[in-house]
Amino acid sequence: MYIGTSTGFFDLDEVKFIIIKDHFAEIKFMTFNYNHNSEIFEITEESFDEFLKENDTNFIKLSQKNKFSNTKTVFYVNCDKIACFINDKTYNITIKFKKSYFEDKEDTLYVDLKLNDLEFEMIKAKIAKDKKFVNI
């Protein structure tokens, strides 16, 4: 599925994650080489939330409040691109992504957010949707 914005369009299936801050989104893709695998688009949190609500997408939303300003950063993560999700209650969330053919190393995303057990189980259920998933 392609998404059009006022500044361009992109294939949602090729997105690893989207970071929205102040109406601008940095979008990290699977298909570019490692030196150039992200682009900036003008997207608001509200418009992307509305899009996710209206369409069947496999993204999770995580928000962190910025410590030194009255703003927040919103992360939308493509569940199909996640290789590892760690909910470290002491520090933060660490998400490692699957490597694409073009990359030498994997991307890692750190979110300064602590999930409670229920929130973590809900995210785990969404990530595990349509996949073989075993708890040990």
Language model region names:
Residues 1-136:
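Eukaryotic intrinsically disordered, low-complexity regulatory linkers and tails enriched in Ser/Thr/Pro
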